[in-house]
């Protein structure tokens, strides 16, 4: 089974690379997509439309430009993996989870046990909760297997 998997969330660790490498190591037929993970590039996505000294309007333009990419990728994915890290609050990841839920797209959350409570609604709509990228790879192995 060929799948497209959208990787959403925390950008400060190598969890995406671990999942992609694990899928490659197991020969899984998976195409991975993701939002722009370079923070500065994402923040500047709307600058092409004109510089803005007001932080709100700069962020507003950039979020709309970024949404062109993320909305299409979420709409076209088979599964989303949504990572919530330990250090920062990932509002974008929570938004992506809600969008997946609204579209009926299955998603798996990836986060530590100590943030279960604040993510209870996000986890309730998820198909699974994993704590490590290795668990995600095992789940992907299972859902792509022919048996």
Q: How would you label these PLM feature ranges?
A:
Residues 1-147:
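Conserved catalytic or regulatory cores that recognize and/or transform ribose-phosphate-containing ligands
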